[in-house]
């Protein structure tokens, strides 16, 4: 037990470094913390010096068996390798581990899934009050699930949602009037004092990302959409505002992206509308 506590302490020191020296955002730290803890629970070692490439490969196999995509596994692997390199720099040795032999998984092309306004309305008919709010805020505001999970009262100002997003970038978005009215009702009925999404009314115990993902998936499944994942709503937000006239630069700002190339990957399903856009933006006569 003492050695296990020692590992926990070493991880805490690494996370403190990420927070105070690297100045990583709250959601980035939350993700790193979860990945590190889950990794150690899977491999079950008493000391970091026991870590080997066999442990890494077994962890990758376990992630694959759980249905994680190659892209997800590689993202988690990058976080683990960053932690291990930090430990090496701090003088911790891994006699049985060769970092250069850690190989990334083969990635399939990313799923290009998005939903139209009509499909979202169809899904919302199956949602209860909380499920409706979670889905609608993601679609209205283009939120990442980590941003949705971390929402607090201090982030709300009327219809505006202001927060620190990915890469510690300040961002604001706006919800519909209907969503605001329903959210106000939720806050009042559940006696919200800090975190918006709580497990028990009146208590400031926030839901986990996994809790929220489960709640959002249920109405999509009932509406006939079997392979829902929350980030598809962010793609849906981007495609929806593009279809209604937003420029790529405007879409970039509304999503909070640093690079326009990232935004381009979020816009789908415009094929049937290209003639309209050419006529509107290219061939309009004075």
Task: Tell me what each language-model feature is.
Residues 1-286:
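Conserved catalytic core of the tyrosine transesterase superfamily
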